Amino acid sequence: MIFRSRWNTALLFLFLTSLLMSAQEMPKAPQAQVFTLTPEPGFFTEPGVAVNPQNPQQVVAVFQDNVHAGYSQDAGHTWTVAENVDPKNFRISGDVSTAFDNQGHAFVCYIAFDQLGSFNYWAHGATRNGIFIRRSLDGGKTWEADHIPVAEQPSEPGIPFEDKPYIVADNSKSKYAGNLYVGWTRWRIADSQMVLSRSIDDGKTWSKPLEIDAHPGLPRDDNGAAEGFSGVVGPDGKLYAIWSQDDDIMFTTSSDGGQTFSHARAAIHTAPIMFAIDTLERANGFPQIAIDPKSKRLYVSWSDYRNGDLDIFLSTSDDGGKRWSEPTRVNNDPVHNGAEQFFQWLAVDPVDGSVNVLFYDRRGDPKNQKQIVALARSTDGGKTFANYAWTDNAFEAGGVFFGDYTGLAAYAGRVYGVWMEKPPGQETANEKSAEEKTDATNSGATNKEKKPKPPGTVVKVGTADFSNPSGNQALGAK
């Protein structure tokens, strides 16, 4: 009887395990392709991607260390990395974002500086720095020589540090069509400000930065500061903007082309946006905002750990942001299963209205250390989501900096994602420490011969095609 009971228990365990594994499996994204933009690992992080609405064959993907830009002229089937995009008169550049305007011109926006201030307290000891843009008139192949300043700070004591810009293009049919907006965090000694500058001449000149909101208190990443600007323009030219502050997503609008803004208010309450994840140096849940230009429905996505582990959430508004829906969980693995989903990015397809979310997903690793890249898609206005695997091979992120975000764009059923991966065979921080101890003890001759490559990241861009109605079916999220 004891043997039979144990045997039945074992069978039950195997049965439940198989059910759990099948529930965690995701179908492959339809017609998925993945390309590596950086063949050799480096400090490549924080990418972005945009599709030219005037010529959807043109796609630009940007990333840092320093500023780099890849481009495709055939809707993502082939990719090339452009040369000499980064500014040469600054030591460091990054925090890139990209957009196409209504003339089909591509823009890359970035910060540039010579040396960071104190870690997490970026305004303390800041050196000359600024926010700049650069233009491409041929879909990303070549970039104009001018690095146009949006805001600059000279090398003087007590200067602010301009950080994490995001560029938005007005591609509506309104009287503000063609406007460009850049929002960012201005770190000062005593507070953090959310500021915005606009251009009405195709990015050639920029307005004096306008303060949208300010957060008093010690301006640090881990102190609830105003950080992580995201913006979108509606079909009537209205600009909607969000960012993280304390445990809330802040929201404001401009109805006059970025000249004035409504009073910023907390629109969506979340858990803190900064959190620790096993094997990752740091992570956050910065939000993004998008709009369906046909229905005018607004969407906001973010990640937080209200369920005990990190999940991706989405909320919608049908009244211009006055009221927001209860959050919908985007990832469809079992709730409270301990698997982390993080570094999401949101894109709404302006043609078919689908809602697309890219994220890293650890549901397939019982140790919750390795992730694949997943894509969630909703065709019912964000009520439910199908989940797809964009990549097959899980990777872990130990010992490398993964930055703060990924990137996503969608147009006419084609979806473009850009992200970072750590290639296999690299040492982690713990492995490096253990190896150094062995080298010190045994002179290191054998170990040095077998020493793996130093840790680093590569940037990959993925495509998926939902325009074919016979594409794969995926499990729905509730």
Question: Where does each model-flagged region fall?
Answer:
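Extracellular, repeat-based ectodomains that mediate carbohydrate processing or recognition
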Residues: 24-478
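Sequence-pattern detector for short linear motifs
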Residues: 7-9, 201
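N-terminal secretory signal peptides that target proteins for export/translocation
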Residues: 1-6
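Bacterial N-terminal signal peptides
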Residues: 9-19
